[in-house]
Amino acid sequence: MPIVSGLYRFPVKGLSPQSMSSVTVAAGQPFPMDRIFALARPDTSINSKNPIWAKKSKFVMLMADQQLAEVQTEVDLDTLEMTIKKNNELLLKLDLANQSGQMALESFIQNLIPSLNQNPNLVQSLDGHFMDKPGNLISLINLETIRMIEKKWDAKINPLRFRANIYIDNAEPWSEFNWVGKDISVGGAVFYVDSRNSRCGATNVNPENGKRDLNIPGSLRRTFGHKDLGVYLVAKSNACVSIGDYVNIPDTPTIVIAQSSFQEPSLNSFICQGCYFIYDEKVGCAFSGIKPGTKFGEIQKSWLCPDCGANKLSFEKFHLN
């Protein structure tokens, strides 16, 4: 029977996970204290007094800034004291509750990330989160799915690459995709399985050393014809979830979760180097109001990736290999 094997929150978007033995979730609310802080890029217009959710490109994050994984951070969520270490050596201790501590973190991150020419701006969500998706979603990873692709690719994959809140074990590989649109219970909590999780370039970063040593989205596309791994949940009840809790899953028929080979887009396609969104000139982009047949060069320069919000310059011509 599937069982909860790990619970994690990420107090600061892009920085280290913090493991938990149990957590109390609330109906319709995000995972508690997860991504409540974020570092807005200096060229963005995020309102620091009342920051609202924005696409990931507005923030310092692993998709663009792999150096974040070179350090290990921990936030005491009762006191907001934060420590930053590298190779177990304490580099900095600060207090996120006061301005001097916030400025110290901003300065540290600016020095850590070569692409930042100014300090980022630390922001705190007042009643939400800074996850990649706007809804109050909770992410789940099935460890058996990761083991399956490890064998297929002959690669060792640290599950923390996927930065999920809930990790489960003993479920059939890919069976989590069958649960979309249905309810599951985890311990005493009930969750609606909202959607599959489309992966971005953040998963290419090794959380142990900050190196980009795998191409997770590209490999998923080549192997299975999609770049999805894991699912998003919505809490439907107020309850405690603990490591060791059993996961009751719906009785669903087996579905085809992967194509045997990747169906390559048309020759006139362009891919976002961050999130791996593909713009196919033949298809256009309905989300952005771009009609089928519109050439990439004809799209206005101010156009942003509909998935991650990166600018048009982040795209390059798509090639399968």
What are these regions (language model features)?
Residues 1-271, 282-285, 321:
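Metal-cofactor-dependent catalytic cores
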Residues 181, 289, 306-314:
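A generic structural signal for ordered secondary structure
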Residues 272-275, 305-308:
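Short cysteine-rich clusters marking metal-coordination/redox-active sites
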Residues 278:
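Detector for the N-terminal beta1/A-loop initiation region of ABC nucleotide-binding domains
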Residues 281-282, 313-317:
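Short, non-ligating residues that shape and space the ligands of small metal-coordination modules
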Residues 287-302:
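Short linker/helix segments within small regulatory modules
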Residues 302-303, 316:
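Compact Cys/His-rich metal-coordination microdomains
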